[in-house]
């Protein structure tokens, strides 16, 4: 296994936050509605992991270090794990497993539908994030995994629809996402290694 310590560090970070939040909930440190706080934090955690995942390719182009690409799949699976926990928190703490209430929620809060579409996209990515799927799908695999950009857009829309008024935090996530998308424009992506080489010579 390449870069085991880097992989281990990502695993520890991924586990640490939910465990810490559970500890805070057990110690009554999350206020009067700990379930909602947990749900919100897991959602933001998933969005953060998604942005970090999307930053791996630009970082590799800028630094030339292959470790960024090696952990990209692991980071993507953490996005999926956090989203699953986010949904479970919603079902348990907000709905109380009342499935009849779910239909009411979908009518009242269409941003839930947007989030569900994002989850389905992540599910497709997680299920096919293995070498067997790469071999089976061939060139279609790369096209399928461009779905991650739609997932990012749906995640940001879901977040925007929830906050509505105070957009400062959302704007930070959206700005980072926009920068990462610009870095994927072919002309910009091709220029990144040249920029890195020029900086290296300057140093």
Curated annotation (Swiss-Prot):
It is found in: Cell inner membrane. Keywords: Cell inner membrane, Cell membrane, Electron transport, Flavoprotein, FMN, Heme, Iron, Membrane, Metal-binding, Transmembrane, Transmembrane helix, Transport. It is a multi-pass membrane protein. InterPro entries: Fe3_Rdtase_TM_dom, MsrQ-like. It comes from Pseudomonas putida (strain ATCC 700007 / DSM 6899 / JCM 31910 / BCRC 17059 / LMG 24140 / F1). Belongs to the MsrQ family. GO terms for molecular function: electron transfer activity; FMN binding; heme binding; metal ion binding; oxidoreductase activity, acting on diphenols and related substances as donors. PANTHER family: PROTEIN-METHIONINE-SULFOXIDE REDUCTASE HEME-BINDING SUBUNIT MSRQ (PTHR36964:SF1). Its main location: membrane. Part of the MsrPQ system that repairs oxidized periplasmic proteins containing methionine sulfoxide residues (Met-O), using respiratory chain electrons. Thus protects these proteins from oxidative-stress damage caused by reactive species of oxygen and chlorine generated by the host defense mechanisms. MsrPQ is essential for the maintenance of envelope integrity under bleach stress, rescuing a wide series of structurally unrelated periplasmic proteins from methionine oxidation. GO terms for cellular component: plasma membrane. The keyword Hydrolase does not apply. HAMAP family: MsrQ. Its cofactor is FMN; heme b. It comes from the Bacteria. This is Protein-methionine-sulfoxide reductase heme-binding subunit MsrQ. GO terms for biological process: protein repair. Heterodimer of a catalytic subunit (MsrP) and a heme-binding subunit (MsrQ). Binds 1 FMN per subunit. Binds 1 heme b (iron(II)-protoporphyrin IX) group per subunit. The chain crosses the membrane at residues 10-30, 42-62, 75-95, 110-130, 147-167, 169-189.
């Amino acid at each position: 296994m390449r870069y085991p310590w880097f992989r281990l560090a990502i695993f520890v970070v991924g586990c640490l936050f939910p465990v810490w939040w559970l500890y805070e909930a057990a110690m009554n440190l999350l206020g009067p509605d700990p379930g909602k706080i947990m749900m919100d934090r897991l959602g933001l955690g998933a969005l953060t992991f998604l942005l970090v995942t999307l930053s791996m390719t630009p970082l590799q182009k800028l630094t030339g270090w292959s470790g960024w690409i090696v952990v990209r799949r692991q980071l993507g699976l953490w996005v999926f794990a956090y989203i699953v926990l986010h949904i479970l928190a919603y079902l348990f703490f907000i709905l109380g497993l009342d499935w009849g209430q779910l239909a009411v929620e979908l009518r009242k809060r269409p941003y839930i539908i947007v989030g569900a579409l994002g989850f389905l996209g992540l599910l497709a990515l997680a299920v096919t994030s293995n070498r067997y799927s790469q071999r089976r799908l061939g060139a279609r695999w790369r096209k399928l995994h461009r779905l991650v950009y739609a997932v990012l857009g749906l995640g940001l829309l879901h977040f925007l629809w929830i906050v509505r008024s105070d957009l400062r935090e959302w704007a930070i996530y959206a700005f980072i996402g926009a920068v990462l998308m610009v870095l994927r424009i072919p002309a910009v992506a091709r220029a990144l290694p040249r920029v890195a080489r020029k900086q290296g010579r300057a140093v």
